[in-house]
């Protein structure tokens, strides 16, 4: 029997999730339909319930509905509660279950695909929005030596320090506060990689870093990664691997087992070239 899944968002035409999940299905021999589901901005819950009525088993949730998905969920995992956001909905036994796989996707990409250890490292996350909030708890679970969140508006970073205190120690900073500091892993969680606007970071901040990582992805280097290259950072990576790994975690939640992500990453990279 073919099961029905989808990715929901607004807009949604750009989503690579159908390609990724169909590739996973091809690996495992599992029959499934996976759609793109465009929801009106003011009609998320109605669209979800209509999908459930069609026999839908699960949804991946993208912008701008991750907070609404959290509010709609009758049961939340710890990582979803920490993030205050849900990107994976499962419809089981009449209940809507919410999870967030973004953070574990990032961790797996860094640790498994890039072979970079997080434990004992000095981490810097740029930005204090939903992308950073979604990955902090899984990063803290890796026991870095330190984790600093830097943001243009320092009070937003300080709010994350308070919220995540139960999961580990987080430091807050403004971009100017980073002058003279060194970090092993620097992760961009802002949207500047999409807009092309440069972050007002101190010159040379990325020079001594083992890994410079941008959560966004696309053709070639993002502006942030180009800066890392110019400052001679050790390794550069965009967020394509994170995208595939968070999808693999959703697959595991829905179907069990773990698909082989490497060939899917390679195929997706070719599609985007």
From Swiss-Prot:
<dbReference type="InterPro" id="IPR013708">
    <property type="entry name" value="Shikimate_DH-bd_N"/>
</dbReference>
<dbReference type="Pfam" id="PF08501">
    <property type="entry name" value="Shikimate_dh_N"/>
</dbReference>
<dbReference type="InterPro" id="IPR046346">
    <property type="entry name" value="Aminoacid_DH-like_N_sf"/>
</dbReference>
<dbReference type="GO" id="GO:0009073">
    <property type="term" value="P:aromatic amino acid family biosynthetic process"/>
</dbReference>
<dbReference type="InterPro" id="IPR041121">
    <property type="entry name" value="SDH_C"/>
</dbReference>
<comment type="function">
    <text>Involved in the biosynthesis of the chorismate, which leads to the biosynthesis of aromatic amino acids. Catalyzes the reversible NADPH linked reduction of 3-dehydroshikimate (DHSA) to yield shikimate (SA).</text>
</comment>
<dbReference type="InterPro" id="IPR006151">
    <property type="entry name" value="Shikm_DH/Glu-tRNA_Rdtase"/>
</dbReference>
<dbReference type="GO" id="GO:0009423">
    <property type="term" value="P:chorismate biosynthetic process"/>
</dbReference>
<feature type="active site" description="Proton acceptor">
    <location>
        <position position="66"/>
    </location>
</feature>
<feature type="binding site">
    <location>
        <position position="102"/>
    </location>
    <ligand>
        <name>shikimate</name>
    </ligand>
</feature>
<comment type="pathway">
    <text>Metabolic intermediate biosynthesis; chorismate biosynthesis; chorismate from D-erythrose 4-phosphate and phosphoenolpyruvate: step 4/7.</text>
</comment>
<keyword id="KW-0057">Aromatic amino acid biosynthesis</keyword>
<dbReference type="InterPro" id="IPR011342">
    <property type="entry name" value="Shikimate_DH"/>
</dbReference>
<dbReference type="InterPro" id="IPR036291">
    <property type="entry name" value="NAD(P)-bd_dom_sf"/>
</dbReference>
<dbReference type="Pfam" id="PF18317">
    <property type="entry name" value="SDH_C"/>
</dbReference>
<feature type="binding site">
    <location>
        <begin position="151"/>
        <end position="156"/>
    </location>
    <ligand>
        <name>NADP(+)</name>
    </ligand>
</feature>
<feature type="binding site">
    <location>
        <position position="87"/>
    </location>
    <ligand>
        <name>shikimate</name>
    </ligand>
</feature>
<feature type="binding site">
    <location>
        <position position="78"/>
    </location>
    <ligand>
        <name>NADP(+)</name>
    </ligand>
</feature>
<feature type="binding site">
    <location>
        <position position="62"/>
    </location>
    <ligand>
        <name>shikimate</name>
    </ligand>
</feature>
<feature type="binding site">
    <location>
        <position position="217"/>
    </location>
    <ligand>
        <name>shikimate</name>
    </ligand>
</feature>
<feature type="binding site">
    <location>
        <begin position="127"/>
        <end position="131"/>
    </location>
    <ligand>
        <name>NADP(+)</name>
    </ligand>
</feature>
<feature type="binding site">
    <location>
        <position position="215"/>
    </location>
    <ligand>
        <name>NADP(+)</name>
    </ligand>
</feature>
<dbReference type="GO" id="GO:0005829">
    <property type="term" value="C:cytosol"/>
</dbReference>
<dbReference type="Pfam" id="PF01488">
    <property type="entry name" value="Shikimate_DH"/>
</dbReference>
<keyword id="KW-0560">Oxidoreductase</keyword>
<protein>
    <recommendedName>
        <fullName>Shikimate dehydrogenase (NADP(+))</fullName>
        <ecNumber>1.1.1.25</ecNumber>
    </recommendedName>
</protein>
<feature type="binding site">
    <location>
        <position position="239"/>
    </location>
    <ligand>
        <name>NADP(+)</name>
    </ligand>
</feature>
<dbReference type="GO" id="GO:0050661">
    <property type="term" value="F:NADP binding"/>
</dbReference>
<comment type="similarity">
    <text>Belongs to the shikimate dehydrogenase family.</text>
</comment>
<dbReference type="InterPro" id="IPR022893">
    <property type="entry name" value="Shikimate_DH_fam"/>
</dbReference>
<comment type="subunit">
    <text>Homodimer.</text>
</comment>
<dbReference type="GO" id="GO:0004764">
    <property type="term" value="F:shikimate 3-dehydrogenase (NADP+) activity"/>
</dbReference>
<keyword id="KW-0521">NADP</keyword>
<dbReference type="GO" id="GO:0019632">
    <property type="term" value="P:shikimate metabolic process"/>
</dbReference>
<dbReference type="GO" id="GO:0008652">
    <property type="term" value="P:amino acid biosynthetic process"/>
</dbReference>
<keyword id="KW-0028">Amino-acid biosynthesis</keyword>
<feature type="binding site">
    <location>
        <begin position="15"/>
        <end position="17"/>
    </location>
    <ligand>
        <name>shikimate</name>
    </ligand>
</feature>
């Amino acid at each position: 029997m073919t099961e029905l899944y989808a990715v929901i968002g607004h807009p949604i035409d750009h989503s690579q999730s159908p390609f990724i999940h169909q590739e996973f299905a091809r690996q495992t021999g599992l029959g499934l339909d996976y759609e793109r589901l465009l929801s009106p901005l003011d009609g998320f819950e109605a669209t979800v319930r209509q999908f459930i009525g069609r026999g839908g088993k699960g949804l991946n949730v993208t912008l701008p509905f991750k907070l609404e998905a959290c509010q709609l969920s009758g049961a939340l995992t710890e990582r979803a509660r920490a993030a205050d956001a849900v990107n994976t909905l499962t419809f089981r036994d009449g209940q809507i279950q919410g999870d967030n796989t973004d953070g574990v996707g990032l961790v797996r990409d860094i640790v498994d695909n890039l072979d970079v250890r997080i434990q004992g490292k000095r981490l810097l996350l740029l930005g204090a929005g939903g992308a950073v909030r979604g990955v902090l708890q899984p990063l803290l679970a890796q026991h870095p030596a330190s984790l600093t969140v830097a943001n243009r508006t320092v009070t937003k970073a300080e709010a994350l320090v308070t919220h995540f205190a139960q999961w580990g120690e987080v430091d807050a900073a403004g971009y100017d506060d980073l002058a003279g500091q060194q970090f092993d892993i620097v992760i961009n969680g802002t949207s500047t990689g999409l807009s092309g606007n440069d972050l007002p970071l101190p010159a040379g901040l990325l020079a001594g870093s083992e890994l410079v990582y941008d959560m966004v992805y696309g053709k070639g280097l993002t502006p942030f990664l180009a800066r890392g290259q110019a400052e001679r950072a050790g390794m550069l990576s965009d967020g394509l691997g994170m995208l595939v790994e968070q999808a693999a975690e959703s697959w595991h939640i829905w179907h069990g087992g773990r698909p082989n992500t490497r060939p899917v990453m390679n195929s997706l990279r070719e599609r985007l070239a």
